[in-house]
Each structure stands twice: as C-alpha cells, then as structure tokens.
C-alpha cells in the first residue's frame, strides 16, 4: 500500500535501483557462467548509431533478426504503419528519431522556414497510426522544445540567422541537433519508466504464479524491458519462476511471433496458446494474473490495446483473476474523456485470411472487419501500473493525480 500511495517516491531513485539490480543480475549470471540470459535486451527496436537510424524489422521475427536503415520521412512512416516497429512506446521513440532524420536534408538558413518544415513533417508522421497516442506525444514534445529555441529569433529580420559574434554558428544545424537530443531523452526516459513499471508490477506478483498476457508489450515494444513484461524479466532474474501463457494474438500473431520468442530467448517458462483458449486455461486454474500493455488510456481509465484484450479482461473478471494494465504516463490521454472517443485503426482484410498462409484461407470476395485495437472498459481493470506508481479506481480521479506533481 505504501508503494501505491507514494507515487513518485521511488521514481527519483529508479536509475540507481536499475544500475544496482542490473549489476547484481550480471554478477549472478557470471557466477552461473551464463552471460546471455537477457541477450534479448540487445535487440532494441530502434537504434541510433553513427548518425544512422536503424529499426528492427519485427515483421520478420522470429525467423530473422534484421535491422533496416531509415533515411527519409517516408521510410519512417512506412516502418511504423507496416508494423516493422510497433508497440506504443517504441513508435513514439521511432517518431522522435524519425523527425530528426527527416530534417537532415533541410538546406535552408532561416529558422522560421525550418520550423514550418518540422511542423509539416511532424503532421505527416503523426498519420502513420491513429490509435496509439505516443506518436503525437513524442512529436509534440519535440516541437515544443524547438519552439522554445526558435523563440529567441522571433525579432530577427525575416527569420534570418543571427550572424553577430555572440550568436555565431548555424542555428538551424543547432536546432537539428536539439531534435536528436530530445529523441535520445525520450528513449532514455522510456527505458527508466519501463524499469520502474517492472518494479511496481513485481510487487503485485508472487513467485510461481501463472500469468496470461496478450499481444506483445515486451522489450521490443519499448526502449527496453517492456511494460507488462518488465516484471516478468525482473522476476526471471530474481528466481520467481513465473509460468507465462501467451495468447497468439490474431491476426498478426504478435504473441506467437514476438512474445513467445522474447520470453523463450530469456529463459522464461512460456506456453503459447490460441486466443480462444484463454477461457479454458483460466477455468483450469492455471492463471493467477493477467498483464497487458496499452496504446492509449482515456481520462476515465478505459484502455485501448491490441484487439482481443477486452475479451480477455471480461473473462478475467468472470473467473476472479486480477487484470493489470501497464500504462506509461506518456500513453495516458487526459484530453480524451472516455474510450468511446479513441479512434480505432482499421487494417486490410488480407491480414486475416492471407498474410500468413501460402493460399488464401477464406473465399474470394468475402467481406472482412479488421480493427487493430479494442477498448477495455475501466470496470474490468484491477489496477493501472505506471512509472509513477500503481493506480486503482476511481480512475477518473486518480489518473489525474499523476500529472499534479
């Protein structure tokens, strides 16, 4: 209870806690002669190395681990839209780095023209996926930072660069570097946030528990650790021996291709099941808790997540199993009153009947309905785990408290 009400109490010490825990885990692995238990953490969904943006192509997992280079705004948009990079926090990070990459070819010397170019690029990238709020959040943060910098030139004639000795240097180039720096801050903050959510989430779980998860909210969906899989990884390093059941997550099979791959790679006891098997494993008494991520949470606690999440939540309620939704504060949208106002992305029907098969698995011309997300009503959510603490109902009151500090 103290941890829940403290809110930010441990947040200031998260980096220290993370360094200490990671050092202890490395020491334990070294003693066991196994340095690769968490090698999955080396596969960041977005990397920025030697001025190159690289994205792990998650559509090729688990068969291939391939990074692709992002050179234009179109590359970044396509990578997000086609799910080469996915997961709400990860696409926020990708959008931020992508904004910088998109501005490298800007050759002008007027800061106001540069600002307009950034605005147009940001608006374009924001259309890649409509449901997850992290894209717009990250892009707005970058734009706000740029506005503060450019405001210094508001009085400059015609928006030209200042050329006095005091302001020597190319301010447009400086602005570009500031965008890169902001992207790096967003990545580092997400890594710290995921670790904090892992610590909070682990406090709700006990060794040996059976845990069901849906879709993929692991390390390749975030900067590192994951959201709802973070406590699984921390528990693995601390000997909790969780038994995880991963829904395959139709139609794009993120649970089968990504979650089971991540967890197996990390030595976690994971069992893959079809989505329509969630009820029977609950009825069998194999599930003690459900953990899921979130792509956008409304002010009242309704949470949009991968299609099928709502059904799992309803089942958990029926069987008396706690349902925990992991939501970084960057994913909480207080401007959206309820889940009814969250836009739901609709995707092409081929993902249902053709994408994973050698031959179409449905009659030619059949109509399809393929929403990428559904909204879980707040009444089915036992608790919301954020990097600032554990939030319980009433969500319309307590979620706002996270932003009062």
Regions found by a protein language model. Give the residues of each.
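Acidic-glycine-rich active-site phosphate/pyrophosphate-binding loop
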Residues: 64-75, 174, 206-207, 259, ...
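Short, hydrophobic/aliphatic alpha-helical segments
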Residues: 68-84, 203-211, 355-365
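Short beta-strand segments
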Residues: 56, 94, 138, 212-216, ...
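N-terminal active-site beta-alpha-beta segment that forms phosphate/nucleotide-binding
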Residues: 78, 84-273
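Positively charged, low-complexity intrinsically disordered leader regions
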Residues: 37-78
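Conserved phosphate- and dinucleotide-binding cores of soluble alpha/beta proteins
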Residues: 241, 248-405
